[in-house]
Amino acid sequence: MERITVNLAERSYPISIGAGLFEDPAYLSQVLSNKNTNQKVVVISNVTVAPLYADKILHQLKQLGCDASLLELPDGEQYKNLDVFNQVMNFLLEGSYARDVVIIALGGGVIGDLVGFASACYQRGVDFIQIPTTLLSQVDSSVGGKTAVNHPLGKNMIGAFYQPKAVIIDTNCLSTLPEREFAAGIAEVIKYGIIYDGAFFDWLEENLDRLYTLDEDALTYAIARCCQIKAEVVAQDEKESGIRALLNLGHTFGHAIEAELGYGNWLHGEAVSSGTVMAAKTSLLRGLISEEQFERIVALLRRAKLPVHTPDSMSFDDFIKHMMRDKKVLSGQLRLVLPTGIGSAEVIADTSQEVIQQAIDFGRNI
């Protein structure tokens, strides 16, 4: 078992990573130890994950003396919206839950983002715990306090920075994850190697097959390394005014794909993979990386069974209209996260639209 701390002064919290954590109530009891007898807890999940894991979590909570209930939501990125957010609010208000309620987000990135935002808003903020069940949420979205819902005009445009009290990662959950969802998570794993840790990228080139066979040691190492990097970055820049923006490699292009094609048609990690190729090609065109480095990035994403192409149905104008709504845009100027090597990246503001178009068009023939 691995344990990592996100250091944010009085808002610091632990990340526990290992196989079989759902079978051990100790991980929940550590978070709930200072709560009341008959502590009210709401577990919020979706219709896919709840039948697999909700009973285990509810059983552990009841063993700890908690008054626990379950809310099941629809499954899919297309449901990360204000309508479903209101369903959560209605459930909490109709149940007369007070400010001392603890909310548990049990699911992937959609559940974590939506439930985290609901926790930030309900009575101006209640405690919540992240229990991520997809690889993408385990290595990325459950850590760092970004919470949000989507708007038809842009992804994650309505949200807040709100940190959980703990993150509990049971790697056994990945045994029930469809391969397409697993691959989507690998896109974020590869991202960490590109932007921050060249040695980890090397390790991924050597050990990718072990991850796909769910080798326990390899999974625990990869998830822990991603969480360590995320924790280090968040501790330095919680609100994304500096280094944290590097975690958005591929996301400016990727969010445009998700918004234009409809949330859920491409998985988030798939869109990030395609966007990473476009960002890397932009770097190559600008002389920031070598041809060999570019080819290594594309080859690893391709080996991971991820899309490296540009969606055929999207024009340059389709990309730009969404990219100009990106949260990194300042004073009307588009800023892109661009790799400057294997293990480093920068936020760069002066890329011409001609270069961006070349990068987008490259992916049509890859």
Curated annotation (Swiss-Prot):
Keywords noted in UniProt: Amino-acid biosynthesis, Aromatic amino acid biosynthesis, Cobalt, Cytoplasm, Lyase, Metal-binding, NAD, Nucleotide-binding, Zinc
Q: What EC number(s) does this enzyme carry?
A: 4.2.3.4
- Cofactor stoichiometry and binding remark: Binds 1 divalent metal cation per subunit. Can use either Co(2+) or Zn(2+).
SUPFAM superfamilies, A to Z: Dehydroquinate synthase-like (SSF56796)
Query: In which broad location class does this protein mainly occur, judging by the first location in its UniProt entry?
Result: cytoplasm
Requisite cofactors:
NAD(+); Co(2+); Zn(2+)
Q: Which reaction does it catalyse?
A: 7-phospho-2-dehydro-3-deoxy-D-arabino-heptonate = 3-dehydroquinate + phosphate
Binding positions (NAD(+)) = 75-80, 109-113, 133-134, 146, 155, 173-176
**InterPro entries linked to this entry:** Dehydroquinate_synthase, DHQ_synth_AroB, DHQ_synth_fam, DHQS/DOIS_N, DHQS_C
Pathway, per record: Metabolic intermediate biosynthesis; chorismate biosynthesis; chorismate from D-erythrose 4-phosphate and phosphoenolpyruvate: step 2/7
Q: What would be one Gene Ontology cellular-component term for the protein?
A: cytoplasm
Q: Which GO terms describe its molecular function?
A: 3-dehydroquinate synthase activity; metal ion binding; nucleotide binding
Locate the residues binding Zn(2+): E188, H251, H268
NCBIfam families listed in its UniProt record = aroB
Its annotated function is as follows:
Catalyzes the conversion of 3-deoxy-D-arabino-heptulosonate 7-phosphate (DAHP) to dehydroquinate (DHQ).
By what name is this protein known? Answer: 3-dehydroquinate synthase
Q: Which organism is it from?
A: Vibrio parahaemolyticus serotype O3:K6 (strain RIMD 2210633)
Q: Which gene encodes it?
A: aroB
